[in-house]
Amino acid sequence: SFDLFHAGHVTMLKMEKELCDYLVVALQVDPTIDRPGIKNKPTQSVYERYVQLQGCKYVDEILVYETEDDLINLIKTQTLDIRFLSEEYKDRDFTGKQYCIDNNIELHYHLRRHKYSSTELRNRVYTLENAKRTELVPGEVFDQYSPELLNKYEKS
């Protein structure tokens, strides 16, 4: 759902764009609509997430959908050569899997080679906000994401 857009999202989109000519991103309004208890409700509005995706140079088009039924309709009405998913879906059933298989749409499962996630970001913000209240800021929270690390990765 691209909630709390972060470096991991950008890294994933960059890898996906390297494997295709035109990258279409499907953005779900709220995954809890038809999967309550399974997915988290987004912190950011669909508009905020849309604007963030729109600002990412790797994204060519964004299609917004509400339900899993809407997603399968999007998959069926778009001309797709490849569908990207997180590696966590590799051995599971998911919306549109059989349709993609039956219609020779390649399923590409990308590996997460980093620690960035929306959950990690929420936890980091929570930790820092709590630390402000108690005036105890753990150094490792800052060290892990220090500007000095940028120099190491800017060249790649």
Regions found by a protein language model. Name each.
Residues 1-156:
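Nucleotidyltransferase catalytic core that binds NTPs
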